[in-house]
Amino acid sequence: SCVSLLGAKPVFADVDYNSQNITAQNIEKLITKRTKAIICVHLGGMPCEMDPIIRLAKRYNLFVIEDCAQAHGAMYKGKSVGSIGHVSTWSFCNDKIMTLGGEGGMITTNSKRIDSFARAFNNHGKNFKKLSPQLKSKIPKFKYIHDDIGTNYRMTEMQASIGRIQLKKLQKWSQARAKNANEIYKAIEHLPIARIPIIEDHLKHAFYKCYVMIDKKYLQVGWSRDKIIYEINARGVSCFSGSCPEIYLEKSFKKSYKISLKNAKALGRDSLMLTVHPTLTNKEIAKIKTAVKEVLLLASK
């Protein structure tokens, strides 16, 4: 939506079936003279394969924007996601790994130009270089300081305080999320019907959620991914289908796009999403493992 609101046209690349992320190979097929930037979404906390994407962006002189909304604490080759591209966006919505009491977000960048623009944009378009001398003057005079159109998307001090406290807890939370996800994976890894995402050694997964893909060739007659979700929920365990797989099918985009992306479509059909947040107790994780394993066994040939 943010791309469309600027009057630009988002172009959708297919994703890798294992990571659910876009790849340099799929991006390059879509680059034209009108392409301005690449948006990499580290979906579910799984980092994108960034080195090939950065090389591609340099070759075509494109900006790289990292969407880290679900990836607080994720790492790529020892670097935090969000520190690799030109600019990154973070979400502190109430469901995210970090939250600021309901809503909020953050932009990070190592570009002074982008930083200056972002600070002005979220504060009515003020040029702070012009504002600073005015505040220091013994006899302040009125000065025109709004160089551009802006907003009032300012974070409150209370929200920032909550975020700073949560930052100190992030490492411990990340460890708990990984532990919870790995316990679920161990409970079902021997089942042919369950395909567990491969996490390469150079990646640190943030585990915003725990994804499992259903291998449809092992499904019993009369079973589907949706029936599996229903049965897991019926056992008192939260289970979802995951992020929107084919966003171009949303009504807001459907008229403009006549495409079907193979892997995105397959993931929309096959994915299960389970909760692994750090406040879950050992008893609750045990309940999740039991319910998921029980239902997958029932659904298996």
Which positions does each model-derived feature cover?
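Histidine-centered beta-alpha loop that forms part of the nucleotide-sugar donor binding/catalytic region
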Residues: A8, V15, A69-Q70, C93, ...
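Hydrophobic/aromatic ligand-binding patch that stacks against planar heteroaromatic rings
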Residues: S1-V3, L56, S80, I97, ...
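Residue-level recognition of the GNAT/N-acetyltransferase active site
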Residues: D16, T32, D95, D215, ...
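Structural detector of well-ordered beta-strand residues that form the stable sheet scaffold
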Residues: V11, V64-I65, T89, R195-P197, ...
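PLP-dependent aminotransferase class I/II
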Residues: Q25, A37-V41, M46, M50-P52, ...
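PLP-dependent aminotransferase-like
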Residues: S1-C68, M75
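Short beta-strand-to-turn element immediately C-terminal to the catalytic PLP-Schiff-base lysine
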Residues: W90-S91, G105-S111
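Conserved active-site segment immediately N-terminal to the catalytic lysine
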Residues: E66-G101, F142-H146
